[in-house]
Amino acid sequence: MQAQAPVVVVTQPGVGPGPAPQNSNWQTGMCDCFSDCGVCLCGTFCFPCLGCQVAADMNECCLCGTSVAMRTLYRTRYGIPGSICDDYMATFCCPHCTLCQIKRDINRRRAMRTF
């Protein structure tokens, strides 16, 4: 009787829109607020509201849109280069700018039908 070779799982199955593009970038820079003034104003005067919008856009719980984890999830989902350390520093130094950047990116990807 021969022993059966063990099955090794190389990639874990996931849930989501499929594989991320390999060479993607942010659609706008962190300080490009004038490219979408509505998002900028919402982020400045109603930061929690914008956080909830981002969380809802990504099918996550309310207010986690402002977190490092959400930025890292978004960045990895769309193949945007960077690291969790970069995400932490950006979110720590300018949470309003990073949240606005994610929302602008979501809006642009929606317009291109890639979100």
Curated annotation (Swiss-Prot):
InterPro entries: PLAC_motif_containing. It comes from the Eukaryota. GO terms for molecular function: chromatin binding. One of its GO terms (biological process) is positive regulation of transcription by RNA polymerase II. Belongs to the cornifelin family. This is Placenta-specific gene 8 protein. It comes from Pongo abelii. The gene is PLAC8.
